[in-house]
Each structure stands twice: as structure tokens, then as C-alpha cells.
Amino acid sequence: MQIFVKTLTGKTITLEVESSDTIDNVKSKIQDKEGIPPDQQRLIFAGKQLEDGRTLSDYNIQKESTLHLVLRLRGGMQIFVKTLTGKTITLEVESSDTIDNVKSKIQDKEGIPPDQQRLIFAGKQLEDGRTLSDYNIQKESTLHLVLRLRGGMQIFVKTLTGKTITLEVESSDTIDNVKSKIQDKEGIPPDQQRLIFAGKQLEDGRTLSDYNIQKESTLHLVLRLRGGMQIFVKTLTGKTITLEVESSDTIDNVKSKIQDKEGIPPDQQRLIFAGKQLEDGRTLSDYNIQKESTLHLVLRLRGGF
């Protein structure tokens, strides 16, 4: 049968098809006629975007139906990748690109093999199979590139009992990874571990190199007593997030936990409890926030004051 494909320029293309043709097949026919690669084509019928694996009959597209062709702009959007040397790389990507795709683009530009790349966004290490949109990475977002050094190093972890544990690590290991290694050696669950270096508590998603932890550095391990507590954070959309916290956690800590779960930068968060806005340096116990209390999260619009 014949169908028509109308482009945004108003041009109409006529195609010979069968009901059993898939959307991929149709895109190939359009490529043959117009030279537009399938991955730049979006086909719309009855207000719906058509999926590649489905057939014309799945969408009840009959003879002399008209599809609309929208071009998927090459690159979709720009993002930035900042290396530890301070160099910033600009990449053309789409929200649907996977982290693997992004690593391949970095390899094309910089020659760094994907297996030596770790990408960090909002404090989280990004997993290869996930997409940019999974992590809410939008245009002009900045990712951080950490190199996974071949050949690792030793660091020491000192417990409050005075015992010292030796670990084999890499600069690109995240704090989560280090806690897992401690669990393997000592049997202490990661959620009961707090690691301190140079007086700072280390955050799970960050890497050793982020904290300038080098070979033979000593970290201090403090046990987080069981019996933290759960609190709830309610957003303006009505979504409720559950957090594991301790009374001694500061409001900054709580905002970091929200960032880990939701990807919202702390400087865009305002937390309200009992009608009061909570200040970063204060603790939950300062505000008498107890187990199963509900905080309200209001977003601070960029550019406000």
C-alpha cells in the first residue's frame, strides 16, 4: 500500500509499504529516498511517536495514512566533562545516550580507553548501562572524569580500638568501594562505617582522589551505632523520600543524602520543619527532629536569593 510522510518543511514523501513493515523498515525507506539516517528520524502518527520494533499494523496505519517526520537534532545537547587536571571537554550528546556511549565519545576526543574512565555526577559514580536521562543530566551539566589508574596502592584504616587494616585500592575507588573492602576484611556492614580523613567525614559517592588520599595515607574508621533512625522528606510534588539518619547528622548531611537519592544539589534545597527553615550547620537534634518526623523540601530556584 502507499503511505505519505510529511516533513516539517511541508514536503510530502510517498512510500510503498506493507502493514507488516516495522517502523525501522519505514525509516530505511525514508533514508533511501531522502538520505536521512534512521537514528535522526522520529515518526509521529495520531500524536504518538512510533517505536522502531513495532509494525504499521500495530499502530493501525492504513493505506494513504500520513505520518509526520521530525528530525532528531544531531547531538541533542552539549555537556561538559571536567578532568582532574582541570581540563574541560565539550561533548555533543542526547539524553538517551548511555554512559558507555559517553565514554566512547571521550575516547574519540581524548584517547582514554573506557575501562580506565569513571564518570561522576552529583557525587554519584555513573553506571555504564544507564542513560544520561536516568541520572537527570541535562544540557550544560558538568560530569567529572576520574581515571582508574592501573596498578593501585596501599592505604591504612585505623579503628578506634587501635587496630590498623591495610587495603589495596586505586585512586579512582569510591568511598563505597573502600567500605566494601573493609566489610570483606572485618565483616562490618558499610552502613555502620564512617570514614574520616584530615578531619573530614568521607562521602560514599566521592573517590579517594577527590579527597587527595594517596598511597600509605591513613583513614580513621568510626562505627555508626545501629539505631540511627528514619525520617521522611516530602517534596512539593507530593513525593515522599525516606532517609536513614542519626540525631547527630547536620542539615548539610541530610541535604547530601537527598542529593544522593534525588540528584538535587544541596544549594537548591530548603528544608522546613515545624514551620522553620533549617540551617546547614545545625543538627537534627538541635531542632528536636525525631524518628519518623517529616521535613518539607522546597526548591530554591536558581538565581533567587
From Swiss-Prot:
Gene expressing this chain: UBI4
Keywords: Cytoplasm, Isopeptide bond, Nucleus, Repeat, Ubl conjugation
Positions of the propeptide segment: 305
InterPro entries: Ubiquitin-like_dom, Ubiquitin-like_domsf, Ubiquitin_CS, Ubiquitin_dom, Ubiquitin_ubiquitin-like
Protein name: Polyubiquitin
Domain Ubiquitin-like, chain residue ranges per copy: 1-76, 77-152, 153-228, 229-304
Function: Ubiquitin exists either covalently attached to another protein, or free (unanchored). When covalently bound, it is conjugated to target proteins via an isopeptide bond either as a monomer (monoubiquitin), a polymer linked via different Lys residues of the ubiquitin (polyubiquitin chains) or a linear polymer linked via the initiator Met of the ubiquitin (linear polyubiquitin chains).
Domain of life, source organism: Eukaryota
Cross-link (Glycyl lysine isopeptide (Lys-Gly) (interchain with G-Cter in ubiquitin)): K6, K11, K27, K29, K33, K48, K63
Pfam families membership: ubiquitin
Note: Ubiquitin is encoded by several different genes. UBI1 is a polyprotein containing 3 exact head to tail repeats of ubiquitin, UBI4 is a polyprotein containing 4 exact head to tail repeats of ubiquitin. For the sake of clarity sequence features are annotated only for the first chain, and are not repeated for each of the following chains.
Family as reported in the entry's similarity comment: Belongs to the ubiquitin family.
Organism of derivation: Candida albicans
Cross-link Glycyl lysine isopeptide (Gly-Lys) (interchain with K-? in acceptor proteins): where in chain: G76
One GO location term (cellular component): cytoplasm
Location in or out of the cell: Cytoplasm; Nucleus
Main localization, broad class: cytoplasm
